Amino acid sequence: RSLASTEFTYNQATVSGTATFVGDEHAALAVLINRVANLIAQRTRRGAGNWAVVSPASLTVLQSATTSAFARTTEGTFEAPTNTKFVGTLNGAMRVFVDSYASDTTPVLVGYKGSSEADAAAFYCPYIPLMSSGVVLDPTTFEPVVSFMTRYGYIELTNTASSFGNAGDYVGEIAVQNLSFS
């Protein structure tokens, strides 16, 4: 989340216009997500943001918004080791994931991932997926333990002195404040 160069705030208490009910105020979050996605397209010249990671509270807001075109997924569930799950699409183009462990005030993260592996904000490159040490004795407790090791490379291209320093252009963040469901 520290990579995001665009930061907006969704504050439900300051949503303008006359809302008929709370779902009208919730629609402003979907509009703001689209705004950040389009700013990503403007900065990268590649495409609009095509994925978002939201908290369970922000997901509820998207699901209850009146004019939002959020469609729940009918695909199988994707459970990552971090418990980030694919939950649906927004406006038919943006894949929405939920971080089940996120608090209600966790910002919405919007990003772009292109069709090639080099068209992204950051790169995770495992070159030894997982190695086991075998069973060894813990010297303090004398219990048998197994340790696992990995070797990998992770890079964010953030040096703005070169043309590769545009990783922050691929990601935007929306702070969430004063959510109300009534």
Where are the model-predicted features located?
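Extended, well-ordered alpha-helical scaffold/bundle regions in very large, multi-domain proteins
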Residues: R1-A28
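Generic low-polarity alpha-helical segments
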Residues: L3-A4, A52-V54
